[in-house]
Amino acid sequence: HDDGEVDIKGRAVNLTDLYVYREKDQNSGAADGDLVFTMNTNPRSVARYQYYFSTTALYQFHITQVGDVNSTPTGRADIILRFAFSPPNNQGMQAMAVTVVRGGSQTTTKTTVKGGFIATTPLNSNAVLNTVPVGGSNLTVFAGLREDPFFFDVEQYFRVRAGALGTGYNVNTITVRVPKAFLQAGTGANTFDVWSTVSVRDGVGGFKQFERLARPAINEGLVLTPQLMEAFNTISPRLDLSAAAAPVRQEAVATLNAVDLLDGKDNVDANAIAKAFLPDVMRIDTTRPSGYGSATNSQGSLIGGRLLLDDVIDITLGALVGSPVGDNVSYNGTPGNPAQGHKPLEPNFPYLALPN
């Protein structure tokens, strides 16, 4: 959820979570065929304070069109959705440039279908929902602060009463409604691999990948050595199975083995689990209902994307130890425990709860 900060990495360029789901599985009244992508950054943002997106970074969704749901991810993007931000104006709004890289061409859009600039939503303002024309389709784009929907009992290590990381904090979110037809681009693909990245200026006029995130608790939970985590963040998923990435995989397997033995039993094949989780992408089969633990393919990889209320930590820990595991927290929390519980999700796009 949060792999920490270093001198050159502030929270504005720190990825926290990726969500990918069919919109009709979040809102039964939504149009059939639309997907929602959510990229959250800026973890541990305190309440009632305006945070901004970096003006020197590129925030990106990478998408692969997958022909066979049981195949190993290629980690090669067929489509990239890229977002760049200007400095805020006197109303606290940042203008966005939305770039689509697809089919060998690149198109940048800075205005909505009505001709206005693509704008973020300042704190304590009504949501700005930008309809952005790209490649013959319309994307709906929201960018701004929302409550962090993540929940995990990390505090249980330090005190008896269970708490839920994320409660009371905000994140900067980029949430996009994307028509499936736009992602298919004539291929007929119904399955997609998605991952998010942040790139920063490289000092010589270009950008370099700085952060990467897809499935929860992979690079933040399995890769513990700072140097290896930094290396993992800078490579494409297509290199996850390469010889150069072998030290990262070895550390992930060692961590898996350690977690597996917490109950004193060797329950799972750590190498098989690592194979199911790497390359690290979020796969979604759009022919079935969304949900992080709703389905796996023949390789044991999760293929249901991720909904906002999915208990991803319980699902992930269960896979790692070979049996159901619960951390006793949920999005809604336990009645009477003020350390748990989030605001209700919004009924309409972008769905995340209003900021604290």
Q: In which residue ranges do the predicted regions lie?
A:
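Surface-exposed extracytoplasmic segments
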Residues: 1-356
